[in-house]
Amino acid sequence: MTVGVEILETGVVGAVVDDSGRVTARAASDVGADLVAAVGAALERLSSASKGSSSLGIAASGMDPSAATRVIDSLTSRRSRALRKAVVGCGTAAALAESWIGAAAGVDSVVYFGVEPHAMAGVVRGGRPVIGAHGREPAVGWMALNPVEREDYRKSGCLDAEVAAAGIVRRLIWRIKAGDRSRVQDAVGGDLTAITYDLVVEAARAKDGVSISVMRDTAKYLGMAAANLVIMSDPAMLVLGGIMASAGDQLLEPIVWELGRRLPGPMMDALTIRSATLGPDAVVIGAARYAGFVNTTES
């Protein structure tokens, strides 16, 4: 068994994963002001279930690999000291998990692309994760898809500013302020600060025209980004996760259509596209899988 941990913006999620990829125990803790303490707390909660584990995989996105390494090197609990550790990006972890026991099980050339809450991507080739020269995964959130200068693009990247939950909400608010009428505005009693991504999706499903338009614009950005990932990697399968899986009824068809417009015909014909199947467990499962890869190589 191996322990996988995902570092989120506001919390830490950990899981014990057996040799078949099954999650046998879970734990979570709030980050607060001390990330190291939060990771340590999650590990302590898993301590009884993780007896016999020898490896710890920690997945973190938006964090420099060296910073993530310093976090795990700072873990002081007796349990964490006994584990061999490895750090991986969340997108790469999700790609590993989906290619192991998820939508791409048995496929040795996979690109994973997901958004929730931020854009992330990972590449598996020959059944192994593809990691950059400096330990980074594809920084898909920074993909430049709009040739304009905007402050939010400089802070979080063009793609992330457009397709992350906050970007989708912001575009709906812009439409409302421009004079378009949406049922979302009624749902929040006119308080635009109360609008959430979930409200936008629910309204789109209820045939709210403005919300449908915002989701279609989102799908266009997602399709362009997915096409660029495929063009660069030429995978056998593209796995779409996060909101592209959970809101697939609104996003999947226009994303596939956009892919068809932007990929060379033979490349599109050879590509298999699937929705991710592992949901929120994908990253912790993949982190555990990555730790197994690293420690097998080092042995």
Mark where each language-model region is:
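Conserved A3 ("GATE") glycine/threonine-rich loop of ANL adenylate-forming enzymes
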Residues: T10-G11, G91-A94, E116-M120
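ATP-binding/phosphotransfer module of carbohydrate and carboxylate kinases, centering on a glycine-rich
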Residues: M1-S55, S66-T69, D73-R81, A97-G106, ...
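Short hydrophobic alpha-helical segments used for membrane anchoring or interfacial signaling
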Residues: A15-D18, V88, V115, V124
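Glycine-rich phosphate-binding loop of actin/hexokinase-like ATP-binding domains
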Residues: A105-A166
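Short, glycine/charge-rich beta-strand/loop segments that flank catalytic centers
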Residues: L56-G62, C90-A94
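Short glycine-aspartate micro-motif
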Residues: T2-E6, S53-A59, S109-G114, M120-G122
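ATP-dependent carbohydrate kinase catalytic cores
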Residues: L83-S99, A103-A105, V111-F113
